[in-house]
Amino acid sequence: MGSIPDKILTWQMVQPTTFNRETKETTPGKIEKKEIPVPDLKPGEVLVEVAGCGVCHTDLGYFYDGVPTVSKPPLTLGHEISGTVVAGGEPWIGKEVIVPAVMPDRTCILCKTGRGNRCLGQKMPGNSLGSYGGFSSHIPVPSIDLCEVRDRGDIPLAHLAVVADAATTPYQAAKRADLQPGDNVVVIGITGGVGQYMGQMAKALGARNVIGIARNQEKLDRALQYGADFCINSKDKDVRRSRVNSRVIARKTV
């Protein structure tokens, strides 16, 4: 288990990339390596020593594409986080955890009807959790939302960071679609990160056939290696002539 640091080492977005529509000039974004104070933890909060943090396309959107963040720069990006609790509530000390990418407020109508992922008051590391994000040595987070890692075997803790978002996004889709063993599943956009996880998730949940549709042949071939049964390149195939007999669950991934 790590120790409580004197400072948090972080890579902060101090300026996102901007584009001037009048002059057509682009001002590159800027990320700086900084040391920031370790905050006093509030009741119910813990300090997590970060083992790994995935780079989500959302992070790229914040930095390169002008997608606004709730917390303004300087801001540490990163919301796919795994690590070890080093301070805070005693029951959590020393435990390996995954920090959810979305932390609902648990009070609104969406939360009370099981749609906490759509909560309008949600907090998100690297966006709306103050200035804190996963591209740092440590991050303070509410303990109520943590997912304890109890038996990861030989899988490095850092590799589990993507479970916070890239893996749980397709899992939620599969559960909401009521995917059943023996179903045939079509994954539209299987060549992206979420799409690849969707294909693997569907197979793990008992799908009879996983059919991937996308346009990048090299990545389609990779999807076959990761468990897809069939792949269709939409650039040179007539998808309308492709038939799947049995129940089909379609999931578009972006």
Predicted features and spans:
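Eukaryotic N-terminal low-complexity, Ser/Thr- and Lys/Arg-rich leader segments
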Residues: 1-18
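NAD(P)H dinucleotide-binding glycine-rich loop of Rossmann-like/cofactor-binding domains
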Residues: 105-189
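Adenosine-nucleotide cofactor-binding segment
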Residues: 187, 203-254
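Glycine-rich beta-strand-centered segment in the early N-terminal region that forms part
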Residues: 37-53, 66-112, 132, 150-153
